[in-house]
Regions:
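Catalytic cores of TIM-barrel enzymes
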Residues: 1-116, 121-256
Length: 256
């Protein structure tokens, strides 16, 4: 089943039988909108949340299948329906996506992935560069077509497992490459998962500026900040924790 509502590891919101029924049908913007609204009502979110990636098939186990995995990671069959859904929504829409390393990790056996980074570094770097370029293109199209917020996460990129050198080469550099290609229009923004943004800041890839905001819903306040001040990149907070006593926002700037 392809789902524009959740990552492979975030399927709880798709357990609703009606949501699953809608997503099992041929994908259209209206069906995605119906499913997204039902999820929104159940979670109380201020945003309609969609996901760029379709749920992948079984992960590959052979380096000979790497090209197939890359093609899958670079194809976004749900994008036309996502854009149609956003046009019909009449409410702020957040599009979730995974950074290049995690996007490929969804499609490769995890043990093989770490082994191939050591055995085939050039091939893996080239694969990740393609994913970064194509994903950035899809996300820019979404932003230009009215998506309000892109939420980027890199859950599989763990420096403590990859080691510093491989983390920088295969994860951090690829995410930075993708971010450099994104230019949200006024009022839209890119939001980085706090684990990813903190890791990049610690390695000098970006800097953060604290902005004090009024108490309220965090993602809505972030979109307001984007409209008023032209902020295009935020992080260091979880966009899914919508209500918090923390009124700080962190405007990010790439430094590499």
């Amino acid at each position: 089943m392809e789902s524009a509502l959740c990552y492979v590891n975030e399927v709880d919101e798709c357990q609703d039988p009606e949501v699953r029924r809608l997503l099992a049908l041929p994908t259209t913007g209206r069906r995605l909108l119906s499913a997204a609204r039902r999820v929104q009502a159940g979670t109380g979110s201020a945003l309609l949340k969609l996901s760029l990636e379709a749920l992948p098939a079984e992960p590959i186990d052979s380096i000979g299948e790497l090209e197939e995995a890359v093609r899958a990671a670079c194809s976004f069959p749900l994008l036309p329906s996502i854009l149609e859904c956003a046009a019909l929504a009449g409410a702020p829409v957040m599009l979730r996506a995974q950074a290049p390393f995690s996007a490929l990790m969804l499609r490769v056996n995890s043990r093989r992935m770490f082994s191939w980074l050591c055995r085939y570094p050039a091939a893996m770097q080239a694969a990740l560069e393609r994913i970064a370029e194509r994903t950035a293109g899809a996300l820019q199209e979404a932003l230009d077509s009215g998506i309000d917020m892109v939420s980027l996460a890199d859950p599989s990129a763990m420096p403590e497992l990859l080691g510093e050198e491989r983390y920088l080469r295969f994860a951090a550099d690829m995410l930075v490459r993708e971010l450099h290609r994104l230019e949200p229009p006024r009022g839209a923004l890119v939001h980085l998962c706090p684990r990813a943004s903190r890791a990049l800041e610690e390695r000098g890839c970006l800097s953060a500026r604290v902005i004090e905001a009024k108490p309220g819903n965090y993602p809505l306040a972030a979109l307001g900040m984007a409209q008023r001040e032209g902020v295009t990149l935020l992080g260091h907070r979880c966009v899914n924790c919508e209500w918090s006593s923390d009124t700080r926002m962190y405007a990010l700037r790439l430094t590499k």
